[in-house]
A protein has these predicted regions:
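N-terminal hydrophobic or amphipathic helices/low-complexity stretches enriched
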Residues: 1-16
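A broad, low-specificity signal for short, low-complexity segments enriched in glycine/proline
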Residues: 2-4, 28-29, 88-91
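Cofactor-binding active-site loop characterized by glycine-rich and histidine/acidic residues
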Residues: 9, 20-23, 35-128
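Histidine-centered catalytic micro-motifs
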Residues: 32
Length: 129
């Protein structure tokens, strides 16, 4: 990987971490440790590896991602927002009763989420069928 690409990925991951911390702080609820620990992996997947199109999030030929530790939604939601699936401003609705950014990833309300998860360990079994 060229140096400029790596630098850009690091900057994106740092921005996503800041957004995740703000989300958890503003909601006074969430799982910051688990969310921050996977940010580099999510950044590389969504910005360098996976074939996804924010303009066509249900493309049948897209790569799919299952966030098995669904309680770490403060990691996935900022990545999806920065990738263009929805506006960054939507993150302000995290864990609000009138919003769609739940504490566990939710596929029915958030474009780019391929599976609703929450119970630890359910994601891997569902992902492989």
């Amino acid at each position: 990987m060229e140096k400029t690409k790596l630098t850009q990925l690091k900057l994106t991951a740092a921005k996503a971490r800041l957004l995740a911390v703000e989300m958890v702080h503003d909601a006074a609820s969430g799982h910051p440790g688990g969310s921050l620990s996977c940010m580099d992996v999510l950044t590389d997947l969504y910005f360098s590896q996976m074939r996804v199109d924010p303009k066509n999030p249900h493309d049948p030929d897209r790569d799919r991602f299952v966030m098995s530790k669904g309680h770490c939604s403060p990691a996935l939601y900022p990545i999806l927002a920065l990738r263009g699936f929805f506006p960054v401003e939507n993150l302000k609705m995290f864990r609000r009763i009138d919003g769609h950014m739940s504490g566990h990833v939710e596929m029915h309300y958030n474009p780019g989420v391929d599976m609703s998860t929450g119970s630890l360990g359910q994601g891997i079994s569902a992902a492989v069928g």
